Amino acid sequence: MKHLSLLLSFIFLTSACSEKPHKEKYEANWESLKQYTVPEWWKDMKFGIYFHWGPYSVPAYKEWYSHWMYEDGNKIREYHEKTYGNLKDFGYKDFIPMFTAEKFNADEWAKLFKDAGAQFAGPVAEHSDGFAMWDSELTEWNSAKMGPKKDIVKLMADAVRKQGMKYIITYHRHWLYAWYPTWDKSTDAGDPKYAGLYGPYVPKGSFKMGEKVPTAYPDDKFNQEWLDRLNELMDKYEPDIIWFDNKMNIIGEKYRMLFLANFYNNAEKWGKEVVCTYKAKDMAEGSAVLDLERSRMSEMKPFPWLTDDSIDWDSWCYIDAARYKTTNRLIDFLVDVVSKNGAVLLNINPKANGEIPSETKERLLQMGQWLKLNGEAIYGTRTWNVYGEGPQKIVEGHLSEFKNSEAVAQDIRFTQKNGQLYAIALDWPEDGKLTIKTLKKGNPYINNFESVSMLGCNDNLEFNQSDEGLVVTFPTEKPCDYAFVLKIN
């Protein structure tokens, strides 16, 4: 019996030793990462909200304040020195105690986002300034230990999920490299004891804008810290979506691939599907979701894409002199993007004390009212045969939204869902009649029309198909204040 027990023990140990370690689905190379497929839930997502909020909100003078305040000759440096004093005595770090967020309420914010019609929402987890908005064990420069003394990322994760939305975090840390003049001993940024916030020493002239080739690249230590913070965010908060700012290509390719493989493999363990977004050529095409900034596509795309834009024409964070986009502009932008297989991530601008400006609330709630009435033509829809028609010509390219004109009634966008076609007029026709040229007699798409109605109106509308198009007579009263949705059977 003793010999039998020894034999069984030997067999068990031999078997255990011969077992191969579990092979994860994704490996840290682009070929493997291109196996990723976009989740169906993401294709249904059309509208999300995030916010730029941090110590840079205190001076209320744009989110790049922390960089420009150290730049010779910049008007923000002149403003800073006049208002707060010289950079040796009052640097960016000194805004952190002033970032108190005493009026911040995560549940109220999340409810506002939900009421605005958002399907996903979340914070900038770390901006270019290097200040972490979560309770990090990797840096003391974080919102749980300083400033608000709150784990903003966790509080928002709990509140957003309570509202039934997907949770997004955005990450901009790669911009920190050479963001501050750590070579300049005449400022606090050049003091090594603040390197945990301002980053490593870099030679003068190292900073370059996102589209320019830098003269120096981050070393492995910076790259590893970039990755470690991401891994900490993943482990602590299990985000559904991780969004990256541009310029991520300065991070070593190995570290970018390690992150993405880790995120996708973690999602397998979490039992859910996730989304990562990237800009330009920062990741391999097909490995994640492409994101644009303050711009949109001019044509329909076969792949889902995202664009992020701010509610303010000039800034991503709160500024006293904000120029708010109109609700009409925001809704037209959303409709156009959705018709081309895209989704919108709208940035808003909380004040340093945690208040959301009344102008922002007003626009969000107006968007929510419109989506409550017309959401069936937006949420869960897919592209049709063509995205639309009309005189508006969209200019493509980074930050090109400033060049795009306002839409008119003849600008029409199409979506479809469950065999139902929607035609969305971006304004109300002056004569009360809309001609949809795409649906003229003999068009290659659809010629048998049973009825045409407008969302928000009870009665069917009069229509006539001619050689010029499908001519629809609008109701006498508008059902809403913005884009108008025709439901075509």
Show which residues each predicted segment covers.
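Bacterial Sec-dependent N-terminal signal peptides
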Residues: M1-H22
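Mature catalytic domains of secreted/periplasmic carbohydrate-active enzymes
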Residues: K20-N489
